[in-house]
Regions:
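N-terminal [4Fe-4S]-dependent radical SAM core
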Residues: 1-22, 31, 35-42, 166-174, ...
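Conserved Radical SAM active-site core
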Residues: 2-3, 17, 32-118, 122-123
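Residues at the C-termini of beta-strands that transition into short coil/loop
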Residues: 7, 103, 134, 158
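Glycine-centered loop/turn positions within well-structured domains
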Residues: 28
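Short glycine-rich, flexible loops that bind phosphorylated cofactors or substrates
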Residues: 76, 138-139
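P-loop/Walker A phosphate-binding loop and immediately adjacent motor/lid segment at beta-alpha junctions
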Residues: 83-91, 140-181
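Receiver (REC) domain switch/active-site residues of two-component response regulators
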Residues: 128
Length: 181
């Protein structure tokens, strides 16, 4: 698996201050994608041990809230395989840090569609928040937090796993599905 970029101290792609990994490779190719340069599976650099260790070290400070994974497309089968053991390591080392994952696929497509692989369920088990659905230019809304178009959902994966149905995440402190640190 390759990656196009690693951003440290990112505040745009999930709650709080985060490290963000942009994987390479996307077959969906949404019109008006903000990250076209990551469509090729060979874009960027190899996601090797040096890159993994740099990300793990970047998650150490208390002010870093977690890791966000974007693309390209993290849920391409090749990328699922490349990410599953790494996200397992992140969760084991930093259980208090959240993992956000952005995908152009819907949760339903991932759990019962052609993108489901032998790695999918395990990969999803390490993800705290899944932002799903393709970016749709006609539904673009710059007032939305953490997503680009209104068709995209922010899914609370722990609540979804517990109930067996999609539970949306909310950052409203009164009706939140998550606890604040």
């Amino acid at each position: 698996m390759n990656y196009s970029t690693i951003k440290y101290c990112d505040i745009a792609n999930g709650e709080g201050v985060r490290t963000t990994l942009f994987v390479s490779g996307c077959r969906r190719r949404c019109p008006f994608c903000f990250n076209e340069e990551a469509w090729s599976f060979t874009a960027g650099r190899l996601f090797d041990d040096e890159a993994r260790q740099a990300i793990l070290a970047s998650l150490e400070p208390a002010y870093i809230d977690g890791l966000s994974v974007l693309g390209g497309e993290p849920m391409e089968p090749e990328n699922q395989h490349g990410l599953v053991s790494f996200l397992e390591t992140v969760k084991a080392r930093y259980p208090e840090k959240s993992i956000w994952c952005y995908t152009g696929d819907t949760y339903e497509e991932l759990t019962s569609g052609p993108k489901r692989t032998e790695d999918t369920d395990r990969l999803l088990s390490f993800i705290d928040i899944l932002v799903d659905g393709p970016f749709v230019q006609d539904l673009k809304d710059i007032t939305l937090r953490f997503r680009g178009s209104s068709n995209q959902r922010i899914i609370d994966m722990a609540a979804t796993r517990a109930t067996g149905k999609v539970v949306l995440w909310t950052d409203d402190p009164v009706f939140s599905t998550h606890t604040m640190n």
